[in-house]
Amino acid sequence: MPFFFSGYAMNALPVRLEAVIFDWAGTLVDFGSFAPTRVFVEAFAQFGVALTLEQARGPMGMGKWDHIRALCDDPGIASQYQERFGALPDDAAVTAIYERFLPMQLEKVAEYSDVIPGALQTLREIRERGLKVGSCSGYPASVMRRVLERALAGGLEIATVVASDQVPRARPAPAMALKNAVELGVADVAACVKVDDTGVGIEEGRRAGMWSVGLLLSGNAAGLTRDAYQALDEVGREAARARARQAFASAEPHYFIDTIADLPSVLSDIEARLASAERP
């Protein structure tokens, strides 16, 4: 006989969604995810290392120390550092860059934290469906406090927020997504959806056993400002989608959408699949 707990039989599959867990930059706020990329470029420049925006975007979604470590492992970046300092960048060098990066990020993050169009309406629809809402970010908690202040001023509020320095291992490990599930009181991770604009964020959701949705045009993968996005014709948008899909290929999201405004129809499709006994 199955054992019942919180409305679920222990050997039963979920038949409806319970929660949606969002990334922040490039997903809910900061169209194009420019706040971290530009500050990475500026922080490395202070050590005599030239970074392009494209290079800075590469490891996006990771915790910021890990992001800097990944950048320093790039041969071209490492060789610049070695030429300047006479040695390859070790963990102490990464920490030094991070300590330069963090106050710069704290100072500038609010400038890039405007709410992405469609986010408020989508969150309202999600809550009207009776679903819980959580979130997580590659930002540390100190930076997230600034982001949340700006988001609240724009009418966006999410109570459950997990920062990268609040778990033992951040993305692509599943800890932040799973911490959300625990704090939200979710009974089955298969009844959760993770929405993100980075490959490691999508992988985080998959490793957590959740449905994963990749954002093609509002975030890091496309790297478009809101004005640039709006100026694209359909041919240009399809080209940007193709580039983003390629960037997400190894992460294998269950769904692709352009921006958060397109999420409600995906949630309806996932609920239909759950009702048919599918799992992520």
Swiss-Prot record:
Binding site for Mg(2+): 23, 25, 197
CC cofactor note: Binds 1 Mg(2+) ion per subunit.
UniProt cofactor(s): Mg(2+)
Active site positions: 23 (nucleophile), 64 (schiff-base intermediate with substrate)
Catalytically driven reaction(s): phosphonoacetaldehyde + H2O = acetaldehyde + phosphate + H(+)
SUPFAM superfamilies linked to this entry: HAD-like
UniProtKB keywords: Hydrolase, Magnesium, Metal-binding, Schiff base
An example Gene Ontology CC term for this record: cytosol
EC number: 3.11.1.1
One Pfam family of this chain: Hydrolase
Keyword Hydrolase annotated: yes
Keyword Nucleotide-binding among UniProt keywords: no
Quaternary structure note: Homodimer.
Family listed: Belongs to the HAD-like hydrolase superfamily. PhnX family.
Task of the protein: Involved in phosphonate degradation.
Protein name per the record: Phosphonoacetaldehyde hydrolase
Gene name for this UniProt entry: phnX
